[in-house]
């Protein structure tokens, strides 16, 4: 499933990393990404959503903070949230 760039998702002044984190969190919560699945890399997220790699990394770290994902050094972020 090809997602629209986050710039097309809303027109408010919410930072892009927050919008991307919300999008990913929604996809985790709706079952697009299930417990144990790997999230796209920051490079792939950056390209797909037309943001910088730093923005994508910040969004992924928000998912770690919220308990939706975990990250082990040199490995992709993994979904840990369960419905």
Question: Where is each model-derived feature located?
Answer:
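Extreme N-terminal segment that seeds HTH/winged-HTH DNA-binding domains in transcriptional regulators
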Residues: 1-70, 75, 81-83
């Amino acid at each position: 499933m090809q997602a629209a760039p986050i710039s097309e998702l809303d027109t408010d002044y919410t930072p892009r990393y927050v919008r991307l984190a919300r999008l990913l969190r929604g996809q985790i919560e709706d079952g697009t990404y299930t417990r144990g699945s790997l999230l796209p890399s920051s490079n792939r997220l950056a390209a797909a959503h037309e943001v910088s790699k730093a923005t994508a990394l910040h969004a992924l770290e928000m998912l770690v903070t919220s308990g939706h994902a975990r990250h082990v050094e040199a490995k992709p972020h993994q979904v840990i949230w369960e419905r």
